[in-house]
Amino acid sequence: MQEGKISQIIGPVVDVDFPEGQLPSILDALTITRPDGSRLVLETQQHLGEERVRTVAMESTDGLIRGLSVANTGRPIQAPVGEGVLGRMLNVVGDPIDGRGPVNATKTYSIHRSAPKFEDLSTKAEMFETGIKVIDLLEPYSRGGKTGLFGGAGVGKTVLIMELINNIAKQQSGYSVFAGVGERTREGNDLWHEMMESGVIDKTALVFGQMNEPPGARARVALTGLSIAEYFRDEEHRDVLLFIDNIFRFTQAGSEVSALLGRMPSAVGYQPTLATEMGELQDRITSTKNGSVTSVQAIYVPADDLTDPAPATAFAHLDATTVLSRQIAELGIYPAVDPLDSTSRILDPNVIGDDHYDTAQSVKQILQRYKDLQDIIAILGMDELSDEDKLVVARARKVQRFLSQPFFVAEAFTGLAGKYVKLEDSIKGFKEIIAGKHDNLPEGAFYLVGTIEEAIEKAKTL
């Protein structure tokens, strides 16, 4: 194992000198044993001349001094994989952070891997039920597909991801991997305790590199989580779920690292390699003939601007998008999904069937008509509308409220029991509202209920 010496430390960037001809390869992991015995991992990023490499640290560089000895491992960062990581919480380099002793994983995978070969990819399209009405009806997720949850600050991305983990892990009993990338540590802590209580933890591996970590860890932790998921797909031939919260922080960390390495910034100050980095990550999240990785990624939208380069680059890779809207959150409708802005590639009668497709289209039409009429209502009031339009508005408002739903993970906030709504129940409910079967019920009956039967029961109490 070749040894080098630290020559310079600038925040999370560390320069290391090696003897001539012994430079580590790009992306190789280097390790430093600190004076207190703890291990710090660096990742090689640049070669500066014949004898020096520039590296990025995966943890805080506090307490490092020039001249400390650095060992070259000769390979990229290795993540522990397999059944041993289920029920455990790891950091970016695969060390446990849950205080429950060492991880007993026999195999490791490099966090930098090539995407599956073109001929190994699977192309079949099938829907994947989440139990959330607005998603299953209007932007169905595909098994083995990639879904993005877009939203500004505080509109409910993390709550929606936690609900999806809860529903899918309970209903489908598959393995899940959760990568927490640059988000709040408190939310990770909540997720951990909730999973412990619900018993879902035994089928889930959690990997965290949160807001307080240096950019190196935040830029790599998504890859660690992905490697764990790839093992289950490729070696155990399973269908795995990969949750990433938040993919924007992956880009943000990449931008910090890029600036620290002295690269010229590109549009809006992002790194010039933005599209490449995103592509390398997203291309590995895919389904092969062996198994599938279905991913749900929360994507923070800076200043609610969907044209910002970070969310715009992520858009290109996704099969379905769920856009969370502040206007809908302000109406008190949760999940605050914008039914007209969200899309899905499999919203196609050949995949989901005519009944589902026609219902989804009629819901979108009635909501779009209501949106068009809102300007007239704001200026002239409801009385100026034709009888036909008044009926459209009344039904659209019921549809809008029926798109809300009480969540299991939000029971503490809403005081209502969570609901898992089967797809056929969703379709039936929306068809009946649009057909006018429930024109006699008040709007409030449709707010925060599961099935249409619950709305009818609720109407009796109003």
Curated annotation (Swiss-Prot):
Keyword Ion transport on entry: yes
Catalytic activity: ATP + H2O + 4 H(+)(in) = ADP + phosphate + 5 H(+)(out)
UniProt-annotated location(s): Cell inner membrane
EC number: 7.1.2.2
Organism: Chlorobium luteolum (strain DSM 273 / BCRC 81028 / 2530) (Pelodictyon luteolum)
Known role: Produces ATP from ADP in the presence of a proton gradient across the membrane. The catalytic sites are hosted primarily by the beta subunits.
Pfam family name, one: ATP-synt_VA_C
Keywords: ATP synthesis, ATP-binding, Cell inner membrane, Cell membrane, CF(1), Hydrogen ion transport, Ion transport, Membrane, Nucleotide-binding, Translocase, Transport
The protein's name in its UniProt record: ATP synthase subunit beta 1
Main location (coarse class): membrane
Family from the record: Belongs to the ATPase alpha/beta chains family.
GO molecular-function term, one example from the UniProt record: ATP binding
Highest rank taxon of the organism: Bacteria
Coiled coil: none
GO cellular component: plasma membrane; proton-transporting ATP synthase complex
Gene responsible for this protein: atpD1
Keyword DNA repair applies: no
Listed PROSITE patterns: ATPASE_ALPHA_BETA
Subunit structure: F-type ATPases have 2 components, CF(1) - the catalytic core - and CF(0) - the membrane proton channel. CF(1) has five subunits: alpha(3), beta(3), gamma(1), delta(1), epsilon(1). CF(0) has four main subunits: a(1), b(1), b'(1) and c(9-12).
Protein topology in the membrane: Peripheral membrane protein
Positions of ATP binding: 151-158
